[in-house]
């Protein structure tokens, strides 16, 4: 069994597709089909078998999942999280990050004063959005880019207040 800190979330079952038990898989890899090259597991570390059927216009994958063969079985998988082992991921280039490593990082201002933390990272198709939770518990959504976040380390990110927030 693997602890969740050794696992990286790389996909989620969005819904079922058709009557043969196929599922629509939203892959967090780039390109989306890269997920098929990994040894996939669930939260408990049990192996997952996925076979690609096709890819839809939104870039989502239509797949078979384990031994699921009916729509009723597939409907129960909505929201099912798919992971891979952190150790199986490739080394990152400079200025590349795994989303799992950004979640809950401290956010500092340009004077290195802590002002909040990353609460969540969202993506609705037009790029990553960082949900910030400030120390006063208010939240704000900002695009994840160098303009707003010029410095990113494994321990913190710096929010550029010069940019209109």
From Swiss-Prot:
Principal location class: cytoplasm
Listed GO CC annotations: cytoplasm; ribosome
UniProt keyword rRNA processing present: yes
Residue intervals of the PRC barrel domain: 94-165
MF terms (GO), sorted A to Z: ribosome binding
Pfam families: PRC (PF05239), RimM (PF01782)
UniProt keyword terms in alphabetical order: Chaperone, Cytoplasm, Ribosome biogenesis, rRNA processing
Any one Gene Ontology BP term: ribosomal small subunit biogenesis
This protein's domain notes: The PRC barrel domain binds ribosomal protein uS19.
Database matches in NCBIfam families: 16S_RimM
Record function comment: An accessory protein needed during the final step in the assembly of 30S ribosomal subunit, possibly for assembly of the head region. Essential for efficient processing of 16S rRNA. May be needed both before and after RbfA during the maturation of 16S rRNA. It has affinity for free ribosomal 30S subunits but not for 70S ribosomes.
PANTHER family: RIBOSOME MATURATION FACTOR RIMM (PTHR33692:SF1)
Subunit description: Binds ribosomal protein uS19.
Membership in a protein family: Belongs to the RimM family.
Protein name: Ribosome maturation factor RimM
Gene of this entry: rimM
């Amino acid at each position: 069994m693997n602890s969740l800190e050794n696992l990286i979330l790389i996909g989620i079952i969005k819904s079922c597709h058709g009557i043969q038990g196929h599922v629509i898989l939203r892959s967090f890899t780039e390109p989306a089909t890269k997920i098929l090259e990994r040894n996939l597991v669930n939260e408990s570390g049990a192996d997952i078998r996925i076979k690609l059927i096709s890819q839809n216009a939104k870039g989502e994958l239509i797949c078979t999942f384990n031994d699921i063969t009916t729509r009723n079985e597939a409907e129960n998988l909505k929201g099912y999280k798919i992971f891979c082992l952190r150790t199986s991921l490739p080394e990152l280039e400079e200025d590349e990050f795994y989303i799992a490593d950004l979640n809950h990082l401290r956010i500092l201002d340009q004077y290195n004063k802590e002002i909040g933390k990353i609460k969540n990272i969202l993506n609705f198709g037009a790029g990553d959005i960082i949900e910030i939770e400030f120390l006063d518990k208010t939240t704000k959504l900002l695009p994840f880019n160098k303009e707003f976040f010029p410095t990113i380390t494994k321990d913190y990110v710096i929010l550029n207040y010069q940019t209109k927030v």
